[in-house]
């Protein structure tokens, strides 16, 4: 019983940290990264379609993304979708490919991004703490039903606390790395 609770809690905590890593991929750090366009969708045959399903996206240089659509007729729609997105990038097209030059981040924009990174990290720490609380409540329920002893319950809660500490440290490390990446000039 206790092992199931711990395993389930740890799985959820791993997923929380992975979700944070994925979120951070969408935060522009001044470098070209095809993941920046993952959330951009284009109206294609009446359905919103992600850019990466309509084109090949590559980063031939540190500050350049090249989008090569498989169907050239979708070029204007791709340009519009990129302009409408919250990326703040202006696409340039030569009729065959779209080039996105990633501008250098200003100090002000860097500070805003760092605040966003810290906010997201705190949100994920709260999620981890809520998972800990839920697991501890499950352990207490087992104690109340006399399925486990008080000592086993205490030991389980200590192990859950260690798991929580481990994953909070991981969130902190992921956030620190992203902050360093953003502040890198």
From Swiss-Prot:
CDD domains: RRF. GO terms for molecular function: ribosomal large subunit binding. InterPro entries: Ribosome_recyc_fac, Ribosome_recyc_fac_dom, RRF_sf. Pfam families: RRF. GO terms for biological process: translational termination. It is found in: Cytoplasm. Belongs to the RRF family. This is Ribosome-recycling factor. It comes from Heliobacterium modesticaldum (strain ATCC 51547 / Ice1).
